[in-house]
Amino acid sequence: IWGQARAVGFFTNRQQNFWAWRATFFYDAMAGSGRKWQKWKLKKCYTIDDIIRPIQKNLFTLDSADYLEIPKVTYIRHNITLTDKEMMEYMRLKTMLHIDLDGVMLSVKEQAKFAKLQTATNGFLYDDNGTAFRSAYSTKIDEVVEFVERAVGEGEKILLWYAFREEAIWIAEKLKKLDISFCSANDKRFIEKWNNGEVDVLMMHPASGGHGLNLQKGGHIAVWSSITYSLELWLQANARLIRQGQNKPVQIHVFSAANTIEVEQYRALMEKNKVEAEFLELTKQ
């Protein structure tokens, strides 16, 4: 909000500089950790209200839910229990930075561990050259495909969000074996095919299909086979179905592996969502 407020004449003295303004209210939670990235958190001596109050009387916020007919939304979590072997390899990767995938031993660097852990919950890992190595099976991907198969069998269409290319390839292979029709953003007619009911499943990455697309005519059920770290991508991707013109209640199904980084990832995402909702509510007052 700093950029918008500064553009219309707010913030004075040292707060005219974004970096100074940020340093006033926030601190880098990753400072001293050796990480190459930053994670800014609100200082405990401040609240969101302290940021909003100086400009609140000049703010006007519109929430689409306040003036559009938005369908009811239900969020459903699927907490998948991995097999003992999968959990053993996951913990080996987490603590010892290497993993055995169907006889192939792979090592990872500490700074890449978090992303690698998420791929490991799906039963595969990328090496340093970007080559994917799979385990013999993936309980989580099997559960996702089983859910899709059941829903399609009941006449539903599924908008499936994935996080990794190998994850999408593996799911696509399984859908083919089940004779479930699908397409992706690589198909020039994917929007038309989806909205016309020509395919059972539309597979999308939230970074490539999460903004601006009108997909509400094609179905009302979304599946996250792997969740995103980005709140913006989460909200925008879900909004492809949660929008005016959707004539059925929307279901958002989130698949995550129990006792893994995905549980913390989902919790962090929901916390971000809560903070943003509180922030927007303050700007309405």
Pin down the residues of each PLM region.
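Signature of the SF2 helicase/ATPase Hel1-core->accessory helical subdomain module
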Residues: 1-30, 227, 232, 243
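Conserved RecA-like P-loop NTPase helicase motor core
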Residues: 168, 180-268, 272
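Long, largely alpha-helical accessory region at the distal end of helicase-like NTP-driven motors
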Residues: 280-285
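Inter-lobe coupling linker of SF2 helicases/translocases
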Residues: 13-133, 137-156, 252, 269-271
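Helix N-cap/beta->alpha junction signal
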Residues: 137, 162-165, 205
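Conserved RecA-like helicase motor-core motifs
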Residues: 13-16, 156-159, 172, 176-190
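PAPS/PAP-binding and catalytic site of the sulfotransferase fold
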Residues: 1-9, 51-54, 90, 171-174
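Short, solvent-exposed loop/turn segments at secondary-structure junctions
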Residues: 9, 26, 85-87, 120-126, ...
